[in-house]
């Protein structure tokens, strides 16, 4: 079986809470009573992602899924029952992704939560037959994720790429080139070009880069020709190679990139050329208030936040997904099953995650928007930037880019 079940997961045997000393002259502060430990049959959830593959992997998703389960169980579980997470590694193989789907059905999971895979088309139709939802995805890229009634996306992909165009134009960029990693152009290029049209512009060039490359010098040379800015959609690993080539090129072109990929890891060694780069994303920076509990869990478990980026689509997206599931599931009276959760999610008109994303309405599809994107409920972006190789927030305000994605000029 490609899935690994983890219950009550802790990343470090020596992880702990606050150990600061209390002055002897003071009475210790009264602690809030601990929540009663959950009991009974576990509520099984699955998270699907890539952990072992020759290409991008997403350990931050698996780690966060288990941290979220631990957090929920620390609060007493869901209506008194513990949460059990099954992490399924699809190994960047559609056949194994299909096995994950069958395992979800066989294990009786209530929902597949906070997942990212390039092969959701091998999963969503299979689990939907058993009323199992595909809940809270950050980054939908397959038709089923964007159209199936059993898909409840919390992230906004591909809208952050539209946000890159918006910010580049508003920053005064005159000549803009686009760089999109191979395989992503099918869902990103159209909305990005629509946004350019809305501003009365068009890309000077659109460069499609290979997913895996040892050197992007040729592509960088093309992207920096005849442009003062470029908007880039790329995963973290190729972005590292890209930024290295950009630094070596000596170009001073301004770059706009996507959250969780244009980051401290991919900017390492290229701090000079990436300084001031703008990051368009789905979620406010991890340093902000909506993520207080997430940061607490990372610190409590002594998670290595250098090896993996948790200020990212995978990290924050998975946490938001689990908190969304927690909120909806906690309000269900009676048995919590795949079918009852599907019904509850379908009737949720105001999912408020405290600023992680805008308040979401799962009862209203985007039927008057881009064809094929009906289940994209979040269409707003938020911005950060790179400063000396570190990501810092620009604003916590969300900007709706629905109209730009359809080529409608801003008023």
Name each model-derived stretch.
Residues 10-13:
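C-terminal motif of bacterial Sec signal peptides marking the signal peptidase cleavage site
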Residues 15-19, 56-63, 75-145, 154, ...:
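Beta-alpha junction/loop-to-helix N-cap segments that form part of ligand/metal-binding clefts
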Residues 47, 104-117, 135-137, 177-180, ...:
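Periplasmic-binding protein-like
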Residues 143, 147-250, 288-289:
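Extracellular/periplasmic Venus flytrap/periplasmic-binding protein
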Residues 246-320, 398, 402:
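Extracellular/periplasmic periplasmic-binding protein-like sensory domains
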Residues 303-312, 327-393:
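Segments of small-molecule ligand-sensing domains
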